[in-house]
Protein backbone atom coordinates (compact mmCIF):
# COMPACT_ATOMS: atom_id res chain seq x y z
CA UNK A 1 0.00 0.00 0.00
CA UNK A 2 2.87 2.34 0.85
CA UNK A 3 4.56 1.80 -2.54
CA UNK A 4 1.25 2.46 -4.30
CA UNK A 5 0.94 5.79 -2.50
CA UNK A 6 4.50 6.68 -3.48
CA UNK A 7 3.76 5.87 -7.11
CA UNK A 8 0.61 8.00 -7.12
CA UNK A 9 2.46 10.85 -5.42
CA UNK A 10 5.23 10.67 -8.01
CA UNK A 11 2.72 10.64 -10.91
CA UNK A 12 0.84 13.59 -9.40
CA UNK A 13 4.08 15.54 -8.94
CA UNK A 14 5.28 14.89 -12.50
CA UNK A 15 1.86 15.71 -13.93
CA UNK A 16 1.75 18.99 -12.02
CA UNK A 17 5.16 20.00 -13.33
CA UNK A 18 4.18 19.15 -16.90
CA UNK A 19 0.93 21.09 -16.61
CA UNK A 20 2.76 24.08 -15.19
CA UNK A 21 5.24 24.09 -18.07
CA UNK A 22 2.42 23.84 -20.62
CA UNK A 23 0.58 26.78 -19.06
CA UNK A 24 3.73 28.91 -19.12
CA UNK A 25 4.31 28.07 -22.77
CA UNK A 26 0.68 28.81 -23.66
CA UNK A 27 0.92 32.14 -21.85
CA UNK A 28 4.02 33.06 -23.83
CA UNK A 29 2.24 32.21 -27.09
CA UNK A 30 -0.79 34.31 -26.17
CA UNK A 31 1.40 37.32 -25.42
CA UNK A 32 2.81 37.21 -28.94
CA UNK A 33 -0.64 37.16 -30.53
CA UNK A 34 -1.86 40.33 -28.81
CA UNK A 35 0.32 42.75 -30.73
CA UNK A 36 -0.74 43.36 -34.30
CA UNK A 37 1.66 45.00 -36.68
CA UNK A 38 0.65 47.79 -38.99
CA UNK A 39 0.99 45.39 -41.93
CA UNK A 40 -1.54 42.99 -40.42
CA UNK A 41 -4.02 45.82 -39.86
CA UNK A 42 -3.62 47.03 -43.44
CA UNK A 43 -3.98 43.49 -44.77
CA UNK A 44 -7.18 43.04 -42.77
CA UNK A 45 -8.64 46.29 -44.09
CA UNK A 46 -7.71 45.49 -47.68
CA UNK A 47 -9.25 42.02 -47.40
CA UNK A 48 -12.47 43.52 -46.04
CA UNK A 49 -12.65 46.08 -48.85
CA UNK A 50 -11.87 43.41 -51.46
CA UNK A 51 -14.57 41.06 -50.15
CA UNK A 52 -17.14 43.87 -50.05
CA UNK A 53 -16.37 44.89 -53.64
CA UNK A 54 -16.56 41.27 -54.75
CA UNK A 55 -19.97 40.81 -53.11
CA UNK A 56 -21.27 44.02 -54.72
CA UNK A 57 -20.02 42.91 -58.15
CA UNK A 58 -21.65 39.50 -57.80
CA UNK A 59 -24.93 41.12 -56.75
CA UNK A 60 -24.89 43.52 -59.69
CA UNK A 61 -24.07 40.75 -62.16
CA UNK A 62 -26.94 38.66 -60.79
CA UNK A 63 -29.36 41.58 -61.26
CA UNK A 64 -28.15 42.18 -64.81
CA UNK A 65 -28.41 38.48 -65.63
CA UNK A 66 -31.93 38.38 -64.19
CA UNK A 67 -33.02 41.39 -66.29
CA UNK A 68 -31.55 39.89 -69.46
CA UNK A 69 -33.11 36.46 -68.99
CA UNK A 70 -36.37 37.81 -67.57
CA UNK A 71 -36.43 36.07 -64.19
From Swiss-Prot:
It is found in: Secreted. Residues 23-43 form a propeptide. Residues 1-22 form the signal peptide. GO terms for biological process: defense response to Gram-negative bacterium; defense response to Gram-positive bacterium. Its main location: secreted. Disulfide bonds join 66-71. InterPro entries: Antimicrobial_frog_2, Frog_antimicrobial_propeptide. Expressed by the skin glands. Keywords: Amphibian defense peptide, Antibiotic, Antimicrobial, Cleavage on pair of basic residues, Disulfide bond, Secreted, Signal. GO terms for cellular component: extracellular region. It comes from the Eukaryota. Belongs to the frog skin active peptide (FSAP) family. Ranatuerin subfamily. Antimicrobial peptide. This is Ranatuerin-2Va. It comes from Odorrana versabilis (Chinese bamboo leaf odorous frog).
